[in-house]
């Protein structure tokens, strides 16, 4: 039977410095487990031992990919940002139906946990912004990418004449993201998605022609 060290070695980088397919899967499993635990609980209360147990990973595997908990947190921030931005980019926000479908998806995701955990990216920012400058910068970059994805869809709507006259798409993207964050926070503390639904529905009513 292979030892933990041998299993970790089998997942290490190839000669070009890239992770092997097995290594990518193992690292991804660890990051996903850490992201779930930190979202359901908090960054502070999530321990390395918790992550190992949730991911089914050994110490040698985890420390092969992450030097310490700080490095793991950085990977979690990137994971949450990549997931959110990818979903937003694929949502087809350039049409009214696509924007409404995205609204429904956001509400459905929040409803599954009755708002618990709040925004997967925003909650990390709230926990880390005052104590970890690097993490704060990472979260800010994630929000910037998210805003860019929203802006792209709103620009398509504007070009198609589907937005009411008023603020430009760049300003609307920031407004939508801020409304979304506020709605998710209220849904979290009230354990009810109605504030989120109200925020998004009001925004869509005000902007769509």
What are these regions (language model features)?
Residues 73, 113-134:
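Amphipathic alpha-helical segments used for helix-helix packing
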Residues 40, 74-104:
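Amphipathic alpha-helical linker/stalk segments
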Residues 23-34, 51, 76-80, 84, ...:
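Generic hydrophobic, amphipathic alpha-helix propensity
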Residues 85, 89-90, 97-101, 133-159, ...:
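Amphipathic alpha-helical packing segments from all-alpha helical-bundle domains
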Residues 2, 29, 33-71, 75:
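Helix-turn-helix
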Residues 1-14, 101-109, 144-160, 179, ...:
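C-terminal peripheral helix-coil segments that are non-catalytic and often amphipathic
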